[in-house]
């Protein structure tokens, strides 16, 4: 699973990416300083691992991770291939969700491509490019379905009807993700690989002076996100980049001084994890304490397969204890003695925070 970090040139996108990954993606006051997407893997902050680390003192501690991709800045006409449009759209097709960084700060030293700060206009600029690209794709699919429908098969007529509904929604300049669809239709829409089916988090990038306040530009961004049914959050990318260079102790002191309670990046990573419908199950022992990423609704054999394909192929059962129960009782053996470890079969749906030992035979 990976998220694409997008935004118009000079909105602070690469600065934010630097902070989340500490990968040093070039951040300069120049459009298209990011030409090839930079990728970074980020740990998902999880206090449960810290507690289990103190309990087990394992040889290794492995957090869940999420991948971010810094995608080159976009300009109007991208869907027609202008600027780096073709590359931009190709890279967006490869990600599972979008982190859309929107400039909400004023800075005379950093030129805005449109000459002024207007978050709603900037949101629309990128969204319209994605909608136009989807319209072209849908038109091609409709033409193909109409040719196939000449065979008289009813499935093609149903497909045309569905595609026409999507086209009408896009013609209204609305993303496909905001359509009312049944679960089956949502699945069918995902199989079309349209750009506007991808979930979005809008990130309002503010200046350090605006931390703790609610600038008018941010209010407008939140209002627009609410209309789209999208998530939104506020960060100061420059401060987050500074925080990423500090030790844990220095970071905690700086966060306290800023009065923000928690870094914006921790919030972003957690929100991204949630947006993708991801949860973590845990394995714990003296060799390793680890968080494993799965999608909500994954059954026990599928979760076992995340560890090794043999675990899934030869799955017998899962021995499960909730994290809170293990911590309360102090050890897995204590949980077993009290009959608190459940034996679950192949139909068990794994829950966030389950601590699991898989039994298998191949």
Where are these regions (language model features)?
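Generic signal for short, ordered secondary-structure residues
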Residues: 14, 31, 67, 71, ...
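Conserved Switch II/interswitch segment of TRAFAC-class P-loop GTPases
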Residues: 40-45, 72-82, 93-156, 169-182, ...
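C-terminal-of-GTPase-core extension/linker across diverse P-loop GTPases
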Residues: 2-6, 11, 17, 144-349, ...
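Amphipathic alpha-helical transducer elements in NTP-driven molecular machines
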Residues: 32, 46-49, 62-68, 82-96, ...
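Short capping/connector residues at structural and topological boundaries
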Residues: 6, 32, 37-40, 47, ...
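Conserved G1/Walker A P-loop phosphate-binding module
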Residues: 1-111, 139, 145
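Glycine-rich, flexible loop/turn motifs
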Residues: 23-31, 38-40, 48-51, 80, ...
């Amino acid at each position: 699973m990976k998220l694409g970090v997008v935004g118009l040139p000079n909105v602070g996108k690469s600065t934010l990416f630097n902070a989340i990954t500490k990968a040093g993606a070039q951040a300069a006051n120049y459009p298209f300083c990011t030409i090839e997407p930079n990728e970074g893997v980020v740990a998902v902050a999880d206090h449960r691992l810290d507690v289990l680390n103190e309990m087990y003192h394992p040889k290794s501690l492995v957090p869940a991770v999420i991948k971010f991709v810094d995608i080159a800045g976009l300009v109007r006409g991208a869907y027609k291939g202008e600027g780096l449009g073709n590359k931009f759209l190709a890279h967006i097709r490869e990600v599972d969700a979008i982190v859309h960084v929107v400039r909400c700060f004023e800075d005379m030293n950093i030129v805005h491509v449109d000459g002024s700060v207007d978050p709603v206009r900037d949101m629309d600029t990128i969204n319209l490019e994605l909608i136009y690209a989807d319209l072209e794709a849908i038109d091609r699919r409709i033409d193909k379905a109409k040719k196939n429908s000449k065979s008289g098969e009813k499935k093609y007529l149903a497909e045309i009807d569905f595609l026409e509904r999507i086209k009408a929604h896009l013609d209204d300049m609305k993303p496909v993700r905001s359509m009312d669809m049944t679960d089956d239709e949502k699945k069918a829409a995902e199989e079309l690989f349209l750009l506007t089916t991808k979930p979005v988090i809008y990130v309002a990038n503010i200046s350090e002076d605006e931390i703790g306040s609610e600038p008018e530009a941010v209010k407008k961004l939140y209002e627009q996100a609410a209309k789209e049914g999208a998530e939104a959050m506020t960060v100061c990318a420059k401060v987050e980049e500074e925080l990423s260079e500090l030790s844990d102790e220095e970071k905690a002191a700086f966060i306290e001084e800023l009065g923000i309670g928690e870094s914006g990046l921790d919030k972003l990573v957690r929100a991204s994890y949630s947006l993708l419908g991801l949860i973590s199950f845990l394995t714990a022992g003296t060799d390793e304490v680890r968080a494993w990423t799965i999608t909500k609704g994954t059954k026990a054999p599928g979760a076992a397969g995340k560890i090794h394909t043999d675990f899934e192929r030869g799955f017998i059962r899962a021995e499960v204890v909730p994290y809170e129960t293990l911590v309360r009782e102090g050890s897995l053996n204590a949980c077993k003695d009290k009959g608190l470890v459940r034996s679950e079969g192949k139909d068990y749906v794994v829950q966030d925070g389950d601590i699991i030992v898989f039994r298998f035979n191949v």
